[in-house]
Amino acid sequence: MKNLLTTIFLILILTSPLFGQSSEDKKFAVRTSIFAHALTYNLDKQNGVGFYFGQLSTDINEDNIEKGVNSFVGVNYGYAFDCINCDSFSILTLLSTGNATFTTDDGSTYNYSGWVINVVGAYGWYFENDLSVILGIGPSYGSWSKESENLKSDKGYGKDVEDRVKKLSFQPISSTPFFAIGYSF
């Protein structure tokens, strides 16, 4: 995975001269939210690509599931209707792979791995100091498979975890809204 991310990063840096941008344009942006971090590269005025990584920990406390932890790494593409470095509506696609661990009330853990694709309709505000804020929401689809389980009792909580994973596989509106603060350079 490290080699894949390094390759993507090098491609982003080395393709800059192919798109005819002036050296004064802001080509890169670092973005962060509470649980994810990204580096993006502007291909031109309206298109950007990048990669991101993060970890989201959620206290669930329902259906015998105490908490869930999701670690992920992925790539993203964004299209801004006006421009990336101005106030504009945009469409973002995010494709990630990751691991999810669920802990049940009896202390059992269930580990899943898989991938997720999100499509986000967003609006971004770009400020004169090169800071930006992006807020959006949209559908998500994921495919998960159980990797392992560590049972502490025979209460059958694994079925509750499977039901939750199935419920989260397709969400017409993602349960996690898209929010990022960024700096362009």
Enumerate the predicted regions with their spans.
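Cleavable N-terminal export/targeting peptides
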Residues: 1-26
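Outer-membrane beta-barrel and related beta-rich outer-membrane complex signature
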Residues: 103-105, 147-151
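Long, low-complexity, acidic Ser/Pro- and Gly-enriched intrinsically disordered regions
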Residues: 123, 150-152, 180
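Solvent-exposed loop/turn segments connecting transmembrane beta-strands
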Residues: 24-41, 63-69, 171-173
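Gram-negative (and chloroplast) outer-membrane scaffold detector with strong preference
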Residues: 40-137, 141, 182-183
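C-terminal beta-signal and terminal closure region of outer-membrane beta-barrel proteins
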Residues: 160-174
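Outer-membrane beta-barrel "beta-signal"
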Residues: 171-185
